[in-house]
């Protein structure tokens, strides 16, 4: 096709927009939302790189998916994992693939799996 230019936004379903706003803004540190349209069920955050993350109000009966995972770039995965733990987030110990990547998984308050990664030593 060749007409796609990149990722604009990745949308994550949540069941409570106020809790989602607090988690993504304060715990993950994305700052104030770019767009806060809670009345429409949508809040969008800048990630600090190309592509944004939005949280959208889920339909009744929604369950989190583990098949699709948002992976966020960080400068140092080990330090970022430790910081998330200090903020009360359950976070896996980082896994290192030497010469390739260090990554760790964690979950938002709604059960959505997220990961972070940094270059491996």
Task: Indicate where each model-derived feature is located.
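Vicinal oxygen chelate
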Residues: 1-3, 34, 44, 81-121
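N-terminal beta-strand motif that seeds the catalytic metal site of vicinal oxygen chelate
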Residues: 1-21, 68-70, 120-121
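Short catalytic micro-motifs in class I SAM-dependent methyltransferases
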Residues: 9, 28, 115
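Amphipathic alpha-helical segments
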Residues: 18-32
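Helix N-cap motif at beta-to-alpha junctions
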Residues: 16-17, 74-78
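Short amphipathic alpha-helices within nucleic acid-binding modules
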Residues: 23, 78-83
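Conserved short beta-strand elements that form part of the metal-binding/catalytic scaffold
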Residues: 31-66, 113-119
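Short aromatic/hydrophobic contact patches that present stacked aromatics
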Residues: 9-11, 44, 54, 69-71, ...
């Amino acid at each position: 096709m060749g007409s796609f230019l990149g990722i604009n936004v990745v949308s994550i379903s949540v069941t409570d927009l106020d809790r989602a706003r607090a988690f993504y803004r304060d715990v993950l540190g994305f700052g104030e939302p770019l767009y806060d349209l809670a009345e429409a069920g949508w809040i969008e955050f800048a990630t600090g790189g190309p592509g944004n993350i939005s949280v959208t109000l889920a339909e009744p009966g929604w369950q989190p998916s583990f098949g699709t995972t948002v992976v966020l770039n960080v400068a140092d995965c080990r330090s970022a994992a430790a910081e998330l733990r200090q903020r009360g987030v359950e976070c896996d110990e980082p896994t290192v693939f030497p010469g390739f990547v260090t990554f760790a998984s964690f979950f938002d308050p709604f059960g959505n799996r997220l990961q972070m990664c940094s270059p491996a030593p």
